[in-house]
Amino acid sequence: MKKILEKIVNIVYWTVTTGFILFLVYWILQITTTCSFHTPSGSMTPTLLPDESGLVNKWKMGARIFNIFDAAEGRPYEIRRLPGYGRLERGDVIVFNYPYQDRKDSIAMNLGLYYCKRAVGIPGDTLEIIDGFYHVRGCLDTLGVASEQRMLQEYMQEQEQHEPDISRWRSWMRFYPKDPQLNWTIKDMGPMLIPEVNTEIELDRKNWLLYRRYIEWETGRKLQWRDSVTVMDGKPLKTYRFKENYCFAAGDHAIDSRDSRYFGLVPEKFIVGVAGILWKTKDGKRRFRAIK
């Protein structure tokens, strides 16, 4: 009887120990190496189809380390990255936390909502949309999927013929921040500078409209436009030097994708990682292919 009890205890001990080690390894891999993501919509068609899943590569940019409990409870927290083997590149398919929580005018990392889009603009780029197509100054490469942008171009040209007055276009056709001074649309916008660390800008009315939310997120202070002057803490602010990197994230299915055209730039710290391989799909020929 004693030997049987010892055997049972031994089995239970090793089962619990093995289970704990496997659980620990799983979470270490989740934090430092990879995790799964799901595409519920067709916003990344044809690269990713609805109801497909892939793995995130966290090694390229380096895995993020932060206090998830402080983040969940709204307390101040710092995001750091482990060393990676590369950096964000133009054209990378990325997975990131949606940059808003309850308030749509205040940048905050949303822990419960993840997006998968393509980084068509990276820190330091000057981005434009010309007749529906993405362009970065100094870059001759095709950004995104040209056939999808052509589809958007044709649709918007029809809209333009039907209603030449841009101010009367429907909301989904208007570009962030949807201000009449800019009058930008998803057909034509820019140029827009995508800030990187140490980028310095003049705080005129246009830049106040474009970058107010990011400056407020970086400083924790309100930035106001008062009497034709940008004001912070009651004092005029003529210029600002950014402390963080940002990117412009866009869905490949340009005619139907909620992305940076509508909610603005994504702080680089909100990026979980770069999309790696596709592991769940109804098309067996696509399974385990690299996501590009």
Residue positions per predicted region:
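Juxtamembrane cytosolic face of transmembrane helices
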Residues: 34-37
